[in-house]
């Protein structure tokens, strides 16, 4: 069992990583006998894990209610969020309740925002079931729902009480979802850790076949990097923005194409290449490193071009609504070398459009 701490003073919390955690009541810290829980999951995961998690919590004396939501990015909305509030109020659940998010990034983000909002804030626990959520979205306290005009535009910074990563969940993960998660894994190597990027080049095949030791190391390293960044810059005033490499372009793809048609990791992968191309055009990133990135993404089965249905101009309205925009000016996360990156303002629309055009599908 691996345990990493996200250090935030009184709001510090553990990330527990191991196989078989759903069999151990102690995994679900800080829950204890007599606590009340609302378990939030989706219709795909409920048949796989709901009874198992409910059972282990009830054996520990926890009182468990549940709400099952539809599955998909398109349901990360205010309308579906209201379903959670209604379930909480009908029981009713008070301020001493704990929400447990059993699912991927959609469930985690939506449940976290529900916890931040319900009765002005209740405790919640992240139980991520996808690779993407295990390495990224469950850690750090970003919670949100989407708006038709932009992804994650309505939300709050609100930290979980703990994160429970059961590696066994990856055994039921569809191949496309596994691949999507690898985009966020590769991102960490590009922005923060050249040695990890090199390790990924040598161990990608092991990750694709769900090799246990390789996957455990991969998730642990990503969580270590994320925990360090969040501890240093919880509210994304500087360093944490680096974690958004590829996301300004990627969120534009998700919004323009319709949430769920491109998975988040797929859109981010294409966005990473666009960011690399933009950095190349500014003379601060080598074409050789861009090719290393493209080669690794392609080996993972990820797209390295944007959707053919989108023109370069289609990206700009979405990108100008990005949360990093200041005074109407685009700010992009750009790689400087493998393992090193920066947030740069003042990137011209000409450079951005040219970088997108470099990555358009024929």
UniProtKB/Swiss-Prot annotation:
GO terms for molecular function: 3-dehydroquinate synthase activity; metal ion binding; nucleotide binding. It comes from Salmonella typhimurium (strain LT2 / SGSC1412 / ATCC 700720). NAD(+) binds at residues 71-76, 105-109, 129-130, 142, 151, 169-172. Zn(2+) binds at residues 184, 247, 264. This is 3-dehydroquinate synthase. InterPro entries: Dehydroquinate_synthase (IPR050071), DHQ_synth_AroB (IPR016037), DHQ_synth_fam (IPR030963), DHQS/DOIS_N (IPR030960), DHQS_C (IPR056179). Catalyzes the conversion of 3-deoxy-D-arabino-heptulosonate 7-phosphate (DAHP) to dehydroquinate (DHQ). It catalyses: 7-phospho-2-dehydro-3-deoxy-D-arabino-heptonate = 3-dehydroquinate + phosphate.
């Amino acid at each position: 069992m691996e345990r990493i701490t996200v250090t935030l003073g009184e709001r510090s919390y553990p990330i527990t990583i191991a196989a078989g955690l759903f069999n151990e009541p102690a995994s679900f810290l800080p829950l204890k006998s007599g606590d009340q829980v609302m378990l939030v999951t989706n219709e795909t995961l409920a048949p796989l894990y709901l009874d198992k998690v409910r059972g282990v919590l009830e054996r520990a004396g926890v009182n468990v209610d549940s709400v099952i939501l539809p599955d998909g990015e398109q349901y990360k909305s205010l309308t579906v969020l209201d379903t959670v509030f209604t379930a909480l109020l009908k029981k009713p659940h008070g301020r001493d309740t704990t929400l447990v998010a059993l699912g991927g990034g959609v469930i985690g983000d939506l449940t976290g925002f529900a916890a931040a909002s319900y009765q002005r804030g209740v405790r919640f626990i992240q139980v991520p079931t996808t690779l993407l959520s295990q390495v990224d979205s469950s850690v750090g306290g970003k919670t949100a729902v989407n708006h038709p005009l932009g992804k994650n535009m309505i939300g709050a910074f609100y930290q979980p009480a703990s994160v429970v990563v059961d590696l066994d969940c990856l055994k039921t993960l569809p191949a496309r979802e596994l691949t999507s998660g690898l985009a966020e894994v590769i991102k960490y190597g590009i922005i923060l850790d050249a040695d990890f990027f090199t390790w990924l080049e040598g161990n990608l095949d092991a990750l694709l076949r769900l090799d246990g030791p390789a996957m455990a190391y991969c998730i642990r390293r990503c969580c270590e990097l994320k925990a360090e960044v969040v501890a240093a810059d919880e509210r994304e005033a500087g360093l944490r923005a680096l974690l958004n490499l590829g996301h300004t372009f990627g969120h534009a793809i998700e919004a323009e194409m319709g949430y769920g048609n491109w998975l988040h990791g797929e859109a981010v992968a294409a966005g990473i290449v666009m960011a690399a191309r933009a950095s190349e055009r500014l003379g601060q990133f080598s074409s050789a490193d861009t090719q290393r990135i493209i080669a690794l993404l392609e080996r993972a089965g990820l797209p390295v071009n944007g959707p053919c249905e989108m023109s370069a101009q289609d990206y700009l309205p979405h990108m100008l609504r990005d949360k990093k925009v200041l005074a109407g000016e685009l700010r992009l996360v750009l790689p400087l070398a493998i393992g090193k990156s920066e947030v740069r303002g003042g990137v011209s629309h000409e450079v951005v459009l040219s970088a997108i055009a470099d990555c358009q599908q024929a």
